[in-house]
Amino acid sequence: MTEPLKPRIDFDGPLEVEQNPKFRAQQTFDENQAQNFAPATLDEAQEEEGQVEAVMDAALRPKRSLWRKMVMGGLALFGASVVGQGIQWTMNAWQTQDWVALGGCAAGALIIGAGVGSVVTEWRRLWRLRQRAHERDEARDLLHSHGTGKGRAFCEKLAQQAGIDQSHPALQRWYASIHETQNDREVVSLYAHLVQPVLDAQARREISRSAAESTLMIAVSPLALVDMAFIAWRNLRLINRIATLYGIELGYYSRLRLFKLVLLNIAFAGASELVREVGMDWMSQDLAARLSTRAAQGIGAGLLTVRLGIKAMELCRPLPWIDDDKPRLGDFRRQLIGQVKETLQKGKTPSEK
């Protein structure tokens, strides 16, 4: 028994011919081009955070200008003139036995001494803040170093500056994990994964609490002036707490340098339309429609406070960010939204629910 033949199948289009992949031509560099070659580096942090992050970096970066040097030189000459004139008055009062003038000179000397002591203290605190940047550079070099002998002493100095006791469990785990055969990169990396997260967790809690208080305060307060004053106070307090956690004592000039960033935060908090319309790109349209203008403004101000806290952490932290351990804005976003929604639900009457 024979099977019937199958009918012929006609194809409309021609068969596709396989094409060999085309490769780019080989590029070669001569010796001159190889010597002048430099890899392009991209600042990933600024690309991720945007233009606002660049403005914050510029506000935190120390600036040196000719006008500043001239002002400092003038103040130094004025101070020397005041001291010289005071010495001359004291000598004249002693020779003429003018005890009233002599007492005034003594009081002035005490005031000047207190002022000089305050300036020296502020300069030391400002130097300590700048020294932290050098410590980060040193830590970055150690994280790329294969030498030995420097990593352990460096980490022990950081622990002492942060006020971590030798009996702390995290520090004890670090001591148990290191041994003599490890290089500086491995020792510092272990410190960054075992000890540093303890301080980072405390700083995160401070940021979360401050941002939540700012969010709820602005969401329920009807006075814009009170909101701005509250944000300024909370942000300054947040900076001080984060600096204290990382072993840095801020002085007047150190706070003054960071106050530019606080003013930037206040300016964004005052722009309710910008926060409500532009700042809702990370929220769904349904949630944005349910939130009131004050609640949206409160969330925006809270997120900006979080950004301020993250920048303060980056400035005061002795180690650079590694292995994506930098806190992100999205880590605090859901918590702020949940707190605002919970507050709005509590404020509604049973009939409204």
Curated annotation (Swiss-Prot):
Keyword Ribonucleoprotein attributed: no
GO cellular component, one term: plasma membrane
Cysteine pairs bridged by disulfides in the record: none
Membrane topology reported for the UniProt record: Multi-pass membrane protein
Record field: transmembrane: 70-90, 100-120, 213-233
Pfam families: DUF697
Main location: membrane
Keywords (A to Z) from UniProt: Cell inner membrane, Cell membrane, Membrane, Transmembrane, Transmembrane helix
Topological domain spans for side Periplasmic: 1-69, 121-212
Coiled coil: none
Cytoplasmic side: 91-99, 234-353
Subcellular location: Cell inner membrane
PANTHER family hit by this protein: UPF0283 MEMBRANE PROTEIN YCJF
Family membership: Belongs to the UPF0283 family.
Name of protein: UPF0283 membrane protein YcjF
Organism: Shigella flexneri
